């Protein structure tokens, strides 16, 4: 597709928010030997996308400008690199793009073969594009630090999910229920019934005294917390944890890293665990199959055309989406 142009959104410096996004015409990317080129059908946004733009993660994920953001995509393979063996033109897929390179807010993008999986016809493009960062974060948190078995054969655990109506949270509730866990969740008052519909056993309004204290209405102590919210210190979680309880922080900041270090040094049984997502194709395929089988559902907050993707960007920054925000070319 050499020489063909496509519509994309990019930013040229740190900061700027939605106003910093610029509509441009740029060349369609050419896949390297280990890459596939996709005609995109859906892209989902994650908070990490605008945090990168803001410069909040600059030491770990420095930008090269101009930058086309977003990493979670679904589409159709239109070209494959010379070394690609498992995909061909016409395949419907879902992929995780590199946070270093991005590329999702465009009509076409290139993805590595090792982070691309086939998408069955039963799973729509938007449903699939929502999965990579949010779904894989929830899966990794619950199966690795929390140690749950999603076939329900493990020991029954008590799990707390904060910000349970958001992207990661709504997957975490559903996955924890597959593991036969007792799930307590927090969210805003308007989303209580929604979070209950996902399977949560107890739902707390985070603005009430009980919700702010994170206390289980049934008095349970949490074996693990999938912490998707911001601004809650470990001291609030600690009295609500079981003897070996863990708080798995999916967006760890400096305070979380300090608490993690202190708890390690003092050999505390109650731990704060910062989560660094390691995307794996087999995990993405697992999540896609759960959606195909109806065991997990993707909840779409809103869909936006690429021509108005800055509205989706602003909505993500606002931080009150229920489920996932999708951009469609």
Swiss-Prot record:
SMART domains: PKS_ER (SM00829). Its EC number is 1.3.1.-. One of its GO terms (molecular function) is oxidoreductase activity. It is an enzyme of class 1 (oxidoreductase). It comes from the Eukaryota. GO terms for cellular component: chloroplast; chloroplast envelope; chloroplast inner membrane; chloroplast thylakoid membrane; cytosol; plant-type vacuole; plasma membrane. It is found in: Plastid, Chloroplast inner membrane. It holds the Pfam family ADH_zinc_N_2. Substrate binds at residue 58. Induction: Not regulated by 2,6-dimethoxy-p-benzoquinone (DMBQ). Keywords: Chloroplast, Membrane, NAD, Oxidoreductase, Plastid, Plastid inner membrane. Homodimer or homotetramer. Transition to monomer upon NADPH binding. Interacts with calmodulin. Interacts with HP30-1, HP30-2 and HP20. The trimeric TOC159/75/34 complex is not involved in chloroplast import of CEQORH. Belongs to the zinc-containing alcohol dehydrogenase family. Quinone oxidoreductase subfamily. A nonterminal hydrophilic domain (59-100) is essential for targeting to the chloroplast. The C-terminal part (101-329) is necessary and sufficient to select for the import site. PANTHER family: ZINC-TYPE ALCOHOL DEHYDROGENASE-LIKE PROTEIN C16A3.02C. This is Chloroplast envelope quinone oxidoreductase homolog. The gene is CEQORH.
């Amino acid at each position: 597709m050499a020489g063909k142009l496509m519509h994309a959104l990019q930013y040229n410096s740190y900061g700027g928010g939605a106003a910093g996004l610029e509509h441009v015409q740029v060349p369609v990317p050419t896949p390297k030997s280990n890459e596939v080129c996709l005609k995109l059908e859906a892209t989902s946004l994650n908070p990490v996308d605008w945090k990168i733009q803001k410069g909040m993660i600059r030491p770990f994920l420095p930008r090269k400008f101009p930058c086309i953001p977003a990493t979670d995509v679904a589409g159709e393979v239109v070209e494959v690199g010379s070394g690609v063996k498992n995909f061909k033109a016409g395949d419907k897929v879902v992929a995780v793009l590199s946070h270093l390179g991005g590329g999702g807010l465009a009509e076409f993008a290139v993805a590595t073969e090792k982070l691309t999986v086939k998408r069955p016809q039963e799973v729509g493009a938007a449903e699939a594009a929502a999965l990579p960062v949010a779904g894989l974060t929830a899966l990794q948190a619950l199966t690795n630090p929390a140690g749950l078995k999603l076939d329900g054969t493990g020991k029954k655990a008590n799990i707390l999910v904060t910000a349970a109506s958001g992207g990661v949270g709504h997957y975490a509730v559903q996955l924890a229920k597959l593991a036969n866990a007792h799930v307590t969740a927090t969210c805003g008052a308007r989303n209580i019934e929604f979070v209950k519909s996902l399977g949560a056993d107890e739902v707390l309004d985070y603005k009430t005294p009980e919700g702010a204290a994170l206390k289980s209405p049934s008095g349970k102590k949490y074996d693990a917390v999938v912490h998707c919210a911001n601004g809650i210190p470990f001291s609030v979680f600690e009295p609500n944890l079981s003897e070996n309880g863990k708080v798995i922080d999916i967006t760890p900041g400096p305070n979380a890293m300090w608490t993690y270090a202190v708890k390690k040094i003092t050999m505390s049984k109650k731990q704060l665990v910062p989560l660094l997502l390691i995307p794996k194709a087999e995990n993405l395929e697992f999540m896609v199959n759960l959606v195909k089988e109806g065991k997990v559902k993707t909840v779409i907050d809103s869909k936006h055309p690429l021509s108005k993707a800055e509205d989706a960007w602003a909505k993500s920054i606002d931080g009150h989406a229920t489920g996932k925000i999708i951009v469609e070319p």
